[in-house]
C-alpha cells in the first residue's frame, strides 16, 4: 500500500508540473535556485547596504581603504502548502487497472499553494495581514515613487515609469544597461495596454523602450491597483535578488498504511524564500490610480 501511494504521488507530481509553470508568476520575476533540500529551514545571505565611493589618485598608496558595507541577513524559510482529497475508487482503479489519474483536486490544491507562494515573492509573508515577517519585492523595495499618477491618460504611465527608473539610477543601479520589468496589478495592466493618444498612438511602445527590452507584466490581484514595482529581469537580476528554493512543488500522501476505505488524503507543498540582496534595485510605485 505504501509503495502504491508513493507511486500514485509521483504520477500526481508529473501532472502538476506543467500547469504550475503556467500559473506561477512570482518565480518568473526573479532568478530561482535549484532545490536545495526541504531540510534547510533557514538561510544566510549578504545584503549590500552601502557602497563606498571610488578613488582617484596617481598611485594605489595615496588613498584610504574603504569597505563595502554589507549586512548578514538570516531568514527562516516558509512552507507553502494545501491539503487535498482524491476519491478512493479512482485510486483503486489506478492501482488495479492502470486507469488515468483524475488529478483535479490535487491541481486545485496546487493552485492554492502557488497563489500563497506568489504573494510571498511579490508582496511578502505576513501572518496577521499587516506586519510582514519576510519582505517581498513590493514591500522590500529600496525606492518608492509615490507621485499620484492616473493611468489611462496618455503620457502619465511613461512619466511615472521614467520617474521610478530615475530613482533607481540615482541610487547607483546601472539601469541603462539592465533589462527591466514593470510589474502591475491586472486592472492597471489592461488599462496601460489600451492607452492611446488623441491621434491613436499607443503608449505601450514608449514604455517598453524605457524598459530596455523588458516587459509590462501583470501580477494579477496580488498587488492593489495603486501598487506596482520595477526590477531587473530575472536574466540579469540574480546579483540583486533571487528566490532560494528548498523544495519545488510536490505531493505527499497522508493516508495511513492500514486504511483500506475512505478517500486518499494528500498535501501539495513547496518551500523557499525571496532574498533581496540590494533593495535599491527595486522601485515600488505606491500611488497609481
Which positions does each model-derived feature cover?
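Extended, solvent-exposed, turn-rich assembly/linker loops in the middle of proteins
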Residues: 132-205
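Short, charged/polar micro-motifs that form catalytic or ligand-binding hotspots
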Residues: 70, 95-103, 172-175, 179
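Long, hydrophobic/aromatic-enriched structural stretches that serve as scaffold segments
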Residues: 32-99
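A general secondary-structure signal for short beta-strands and their flanking turns/coil
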Residues: 77-79, 177, 261
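Sequence/fold signature of self-assembling virion shell proteins
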Residues: 1-54, 191-289
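Alpha-helical scaffold segments that mediate packing/assembly in large oligomeric complexes
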Residues: 81, 85-164
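Residue-level signal for secondary-structure boundary elements
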Residues: 114-117, 121, 169, 173-176, ...
Amino acid at each position: 500500500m505504501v509503495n502504491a501511494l508513493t507511486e500514485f504521488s509521483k504520477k500526481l507530481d508529473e501532472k502538476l508540473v506543467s500547469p504550475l509553470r503556467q500559473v506561477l508568476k512570482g518565480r518568473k520575476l526573479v532568478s530561482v535556485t535549484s532545490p536545495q533540500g526541504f531540510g534547510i529551514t533557514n538561510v544566510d545571505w549578504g545584503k549590500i547596504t552601502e557602497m563606498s565611493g571610488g578613488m582617484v589618485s596617481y598611485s594605489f598608496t595615496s588613498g584610504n581603504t574603504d569597505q563595502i558595507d554589507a549586512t548578514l541577513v538570516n531568514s527562516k524559510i516558509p512552507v507553502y502548502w494545501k491539503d487535498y482529497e482524491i476519491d478512493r475508487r479512482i485510486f483503486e482503479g489506478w492501482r488495479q487497472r492502470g486507469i488515468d489519474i483524475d488529478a483535479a483536486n490535487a491541481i486545485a490544491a496546487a493552485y492554492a499553494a502557488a497563489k500563497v507562494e506568489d504573494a510571498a515573492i511579490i508582496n511578502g509573508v505576513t501572518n496577521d495581514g499587516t506586519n510582514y515577517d519576510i519582505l517581498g519585492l513590493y514591500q522590500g523595495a529600496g525606492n518608492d515613487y509615490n507621485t499620484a499618477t492616473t493611468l489611462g491618460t496618455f503620457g502619465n504611465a511613461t512619466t511615472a515609469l521614467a520617474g521610478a527608473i530615475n530613482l533607481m539610477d540615482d541610487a547607483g543601479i546601472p539601469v541603462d544597461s539592465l533589462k527591466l520589468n514593470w510589474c502591475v496589478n491586472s486592472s492597471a495592466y489592461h488599462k496601460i495596454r489600451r492607452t492611446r493618444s488623441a491621434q491613436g498612438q499607443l503608449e505601450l511602445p514608449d514604455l517598453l523602450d524605457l524598459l530596455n527590452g523588458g516587459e509590462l507584466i501583470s501580477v494579477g490581484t496580488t498587488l492593489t491597483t495603486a501598487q506596482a514595482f520595477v526590477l531587473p529581469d530575472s536574466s540579469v537580476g540574480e546579483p540583486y535578488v533571487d528566490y532560494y528554493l528548498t523544495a519545488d512543488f510536490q505531493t505527499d500522501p497522508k493516508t495511513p498504511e492500514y486504511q483500506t476505505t475512505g478517500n486518499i488524503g494528500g498535501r501539495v507543498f513547496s518551500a523557499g524564500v525571496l532574498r533581496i540582496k540590494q533593495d535599491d534595485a527595486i522601485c515600488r510605485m505606491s500611488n497609481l490610480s
